[in-house]
Design a protein with these regions (language model features):
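Extracellular ligand-binding/catalytic regions of CAZymes and related secreted enzymes
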Residues: 22-27, 42, 53, 57, ...
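Sec-dependent N-terminal signal peptides
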Residues: 3-12
Length: 256
């Protein structure tokens, strides 16, 4: 009898979870991934499957390691049409074509939500000079500028107190320690950007000061979520990281 009751409870729970996902709005997303220095072949699956388990999403994944081929894809007219949101998990730091980069950011300025992960913060701005009196297009969209990073070391993620219950951070425990990490240097956080968490890789590491590692921004009409966390597959695969991404999708889509 006890076995039957336990089995009934398990089946009821699974049915409730299934019904919850069925009733959730389903999205269509594109992921732009590839480039230098990361295991993008595996990460594209970790990210897409992890998000889909939390927020029903149908995916088109553009995986290209060559910078010029990736640029050609994103230069096509209407490449983002038909997608509810775009995920950038790529690393093309040495793009020099400012007009190309602006064409991407314009997609989001008119309202397309975006999720930017790890080396997306180093992409599209290192080799482009800012026009006098203006910010670089890519970093303006992200809401912050980053160049360089510390050594491979676990990162303690400390939530900003006043935003500890932000919808994106609500499932992240205070002081979460990533399995591995590579703490990015964030030289400037722009006005209008809301930092949700700072990362600390220890007193004997560099950078010496905690760095912004999770934030949100609004670029024109488009909501942007960005995190510098995620160099290693071990970090991206954690429940905490994937919960954060699922929450981020819900947040960037809420305005729409």
């Amino acid at each position: 009898m006890k076995l039957l009751i336990s089995l009934f409870f398990v089946l009821s729970t699974l049915t409730a979870l299934s019904d919850h996902q069925t009733n959730m709005e389903s999205y269509k997303a594109m992921m732009i991934t590839g480039g230098c220095c990361h295991d993008y072949k595996q990460q594209k699956n970790i990210i897409s499957e992890g998000i889909s388990e939390r927020v029903p999403t149908k995916w088109d994944i553009f995986f290209e390691m060559d910078q010029e081929k990736s640029k050609a894809k994103l230069s096509e007219s209407g490449w983002a049409d038909g997608y509810d949101y775009i995920v950038y998990n790529h690393c093309f730091a040495h793009e020099k074509d400012a007009s190309f980069v602006k064409s991407i950011t314009d997609v989001h300025k008119v309202g397309k939500p975006a999720i930017a992960l790890h080396c997306a913060m180093h992409s599209y701005h290192w080799s482009i000079a800012a026009e006098e009196g203006k910010k670089k297009a890519w970093t303006e969209m992200l809401g912050a500028s980053s160049k360089g990073h510390g050594p491979k070391a676990a990162i303690t993620v400390n939530k900003v107190r006043q935003h500890a219950n932000h919808p994106i951070m609500k499932d992240i425990p205070e002081g979460w320690l990533t399995p591995e990490g590579e703490l990015y240097n964030v030289q400037e956080v722009y006005e209008g950007t809301t930092v949700l968490a700072y990362g600390d890789n220890g007193e004997d590491k560099n950078p010496k000061e905690p760095q912004a590692c999770v934030w949100v921004n609004t670029h024109g009409k488009g909501r942007i979520f960005a995190t510098t966390l995620g160099h290693h597959n071990s970090t991206m695969s954690t429940m905490e990281y994937l919960d954060m991404l699922g929450n981020a999708v819900t947040w960037v889509m809420a305005k729409n």
